């Protein structure tokens, strides 16, 4: 479904992602874990078309290189960014409607898509007229995911969805991620909370200083002594 091969991404003279290869099959949840500054956010930004890159980047067999962000959304990719990037002065409803912009939904089609999001996140329905900046952290993350779902993605990329959230809220958000997979949405999950990421995914990659250090089935990575020593001693939520 998503094929990333020998990907390189640079900021000026600094190469932030170096030769990364990753394969995501339909119906999978793939996690990418690693320390702050490892290049996780950069990897997602390149996949979404927000940063130029070199290497292979294909979605459902189509070369993504040269396609802008809107074109990638139209093809079924969507990114929930690390800081959620909501429009705080706008209502929950306004933010959700903006998520459907690339699909150009109108009338009944818009109402149907909104209802599908409200069915998944009843709290957003209750707060549809509230400004986004009045929501709690967990509600803002729900809104960020709901806005992404307005474009009906087949592949949803999530950047640090647990950032700044209490453990119980993290559990709820990751339960939503697993339910999305059951409903046919494939997931690329970037997390610094390695334990939560590996518990929620099928396959994992460990990214360190811009390179893949380890990869394998998530359960196997969780049992790896190197992963346990470095990443499972205690979760942190620093920005990437």
Predicted regions, residues:
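Glycine-rich phosphate-binding loops of nucleotide-dependent enzymes
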Residues: 1-240
């Amino acid at each position: 479904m998503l094929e990333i091969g020998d990907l390189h991404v640079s900021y000026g003279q600094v190469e932030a992602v170096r030769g990364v290869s990753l394969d995501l099959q339909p119906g999978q949840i793939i996690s990418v874990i690693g320390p702050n500054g490892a290049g996780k956010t950069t990897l997602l930004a390149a996949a979404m078309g927000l940063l130029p890159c070199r290497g292979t980047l294909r979605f459902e067999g189509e070369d993504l290189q040269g396609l802008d962000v809107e074109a990638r959304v139209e093809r079924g990719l969507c990114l929930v960014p690390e800081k959620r990037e909501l429009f705080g002065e706008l209502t929950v409803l306004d933010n959700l409607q903006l998520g459907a912009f690339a699909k150009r939904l109108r009338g009944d089609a818009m109402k149907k898509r909104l209802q599908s999001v409200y069915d998944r996140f009843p709290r957003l329905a209750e707060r549809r007229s509230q400004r986004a900046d009045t929501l709690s952290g967990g509600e803002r993350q729900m809104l960020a995911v709901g806005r992404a779902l307005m474009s009906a993605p087949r592949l949803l990329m999530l950047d640090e969805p647990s950032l700044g959230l209490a453990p119980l809220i993290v559990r709820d958000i990751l339960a939503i991620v697993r339910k999305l997979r059951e409903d046919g949405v494939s997931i690329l999950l970037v997390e610094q909370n390695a334990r939560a990421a590996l518990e929620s995914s099928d396959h994992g990659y460990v990214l360190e200083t811009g390179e893949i250090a380890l990869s394998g089935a998530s359960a196997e990575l969780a049992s790896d002594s190197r992963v346990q020593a470095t990443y499972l001693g205690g979760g942190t939520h620093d920005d990437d």
